[in-house]
């Protein structure tokens, strides 16, 4: 899998923080997020899922993720936005790869990306969350085009 190393700016994000198996919580989170975006006429700059844990080290019921939209830096939450978080997604150096996801199988491209990145001795993972940006409406199109972001730092830092 090909990837690039990019410096990414901090993003302001709004949405829902979830805990539990990602294959259940992330789709449910996006249903909640879509309702909130539609009800409050939010104009998202991007749709993202943010992942905080390693599923090979953390039990499924404890996995943390956010389903969010990127919003302008001066965005404030509308009244009655119950359960919605507003926070910053840290910027920095990230490895970035594009993938096409079919049959709701988000795990396969992520695993391929991690495997490829671990082979690159120049970089190691940094202590920031991974995230994906959705480039199309997968529910409408039947597949998802995503950009995957893994935080990295130069080896030895």
Curated annotation (Swiss-Prot):
Q: Name one GO cellular component term.
A: cytoplasm
Task: Please name the InterPro entries in this protein's record.
Answer: AraC_E-bd, DNA_gyrase_inhibitor, DNA_gyrase_inhibitor_GyrI, GyrI-like, Reg_factor_effector_dom_sf
One GO molecular function term of this record is: DNA topoisomerase type II (double strand cut, ATP-hydrolyzing) inhibitor activity
Q: Give its localization.
A: Cytoplasm
Q: Please provide the record's keywords in A-Z order.
A: Cytoplasm, Stress response
Keyword set includes Cytoplasm: yes
Q: Which Gene3D superfamilies match?
A: Regulatory factor, effector binding domain (3.20.80.10)
Q: Which family does it belong to?
A: Belongs to the DNA gyrase inhibitor family.
Q: What does this protein do?
A: Inhibits the supercoiling activity of DNA gyrase. Acts by inhibiting DNA gyrase at an early step, prior to (or at the step of) binding of DNA by the gyrase. It protects cells against toxins that target DNA gyrase, by inhibiting activity of these toxins and reducing the formation of lethal double-strand breaks in the cell.
* Description of how the protein assembles with itself and partners: Interacts with DNA gyrase.
Task: Return the HAMAP family for the record.
Answer: DNA_gyrase_inhibitor
Q: From the Swiss-Prot or TrEMBL record, give the protein name.
A: DNA gyrase inhibitor
């Amino acid at each position: 899998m090909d990837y690039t190393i990019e410096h990414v700016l901090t993003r302001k994000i709004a949405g829902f923080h979830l805990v539990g198996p990602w294959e259940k919580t992330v789709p449910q989170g996006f249903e909640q997020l879509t309702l909130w975006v539609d009800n409050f006429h939010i104009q998202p700059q991007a749709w993202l899922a943010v992942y905080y844990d390693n599923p090979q080290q953390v039990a499924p019921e404890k996995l943390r993720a956010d389903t969010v939209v990127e919003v302008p830096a001066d965005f404030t939450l509308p009244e009655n936005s119950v359960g919605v978080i507003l926070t910053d997604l840290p910027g920095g150096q990230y490895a970035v790869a594009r993938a096409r996801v079919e049959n709701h199988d988000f795990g396969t491209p992520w695993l391929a990306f991690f495997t490829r990145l671990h082979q690159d001795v120049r970089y190691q993972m940094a202590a920031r969350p991974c995230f994906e940006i959705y480039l199309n409406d997968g529910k409408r199109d039947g597949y998802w085009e995503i950009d995957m972001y893994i935080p990295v730092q130069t080896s030895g830092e």
